Amino acid sequence: VSLLIAVVAIKRESFRLLVTAAVVFVFLGLIVGPIAGGAYAHTDMANQMQSDAKELETLPNSSKENVRVLPRSVSDNYARSSMQYPQYKLRSSDITYRNGSYTWSYGLEPDNPMVALSGQQRGALYVDITGTEKQVTIEETAFSNGRGQYLFDSYRYQNVLRSPFKKHNWDTTFNAQANGKSYIAHSTTTYKWKFRMGPIPQFYAIPQHGSVEVMSPSGDIESMSPKEAQELSLLQGQNFYPYDIAMFKVKSMQYVNGALNKWLWKEDVLQIANLPEDGNNWPIAVPTEGDSPGLTYFIATEPTGSGNGVYEIWTIDGQTGEAAVQQYSESQLGPQKAVDFTERRSEVNQLSSAEAIAPVPVVNGETLYWHVKVVSESNSGIIYTAFVNAESGDVTLVEGTDPIYAFLTQSEVEEIQNGTEAGSSGGMSMNVVVTDEAGEIVGTQNITVPEGGNVDVSVTDKISNRSST
């Protein structure tokens, strides 16, 4: 349009028309065009999600072997207090699968310009994520082109040099070790370009997972397609699907009834649920059950303007990007409300220097809980963890690591106590969970139930001298 006006302006030698052409170009090309392009991209993705996303009857159950317990803020404190290298500092962390468990992974990168110019990344530090205790492992491996190095030795420079036409998702970068090999990896995004004639003619781009870039300590980079990365044993258990594409998919559902409805009427328009400002961001990566270890991204949504009530939980596979949704007929408690409910408990409320943070979705059977951590204000450790039932609002407060895993196996314990089959030909070892009248876990004990056998469990209250079997 602006080009046609400019041609007419030149023929008529009209300065006013030339200015009009420039204004039209700026307004349509630099303002309206990108807005229209964004709306087209979201609308296309919403249509794709409607046809591809699976509707769930039950959310993926959380892993009972690897529970995401340790908040990033406490992990950061544990990691800093374990640093023994004055010329190095910790890179920002991400979740990494290592030796059968999940950890927060930190790169050990140079801390000053001289070391960054002449030195190398020293390796990585790992903090176990599956318990409340401090468990830190340091792996010393020199990377020729590591994180935090300058100029041509930089990890970022080498990757951009190799793949200059991809968007590199540095927020997905992680250090890891598998099969005796250390490596650094991150994902990239590419774009599928389209053109739409109306109502405003515009090119637009839809993001898609481009590749996974894996760098060895020697600096060699292997660029793999998402499919190749999913089949690589080196990346087993890792999550490498881009976080921003996962969010783009869910946010696109705001456009399911059209862009005008999203902007003006807002009928059936979702919004991403609020998270407390403690370092957690959507999507939240959670270890889930399956044939092999894996992480699932969770994103909670609520109706626009509804407050803190969740009515949908979206899940995105941490490797394939496959999307699914659990819809609720009645509003569920959101993560912010779960934190509020935890802070109201007398045990937490009476603590003068503690706060409830980092709600993480945990699914046990058909029940959704928000797993909230009560930590000291200095983030020096976890005081309590709380399981907040998203349907009823009931809060179960536990202390230490063992009761967390005991809580998640309560249904299995109840099956044994009710005389149902254990489902194992050789018997089964289980955790017996003892709760008081308020539902608090006051004790746990491992027991072995023989095949076809029964076990009597006697519990004695030493205060009231009452017992039950």
Stretch-by-stretch model annotation:
Residues 1-469:
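Soluble extracytoplasmic regions of secretory-pathway and membrane proteins
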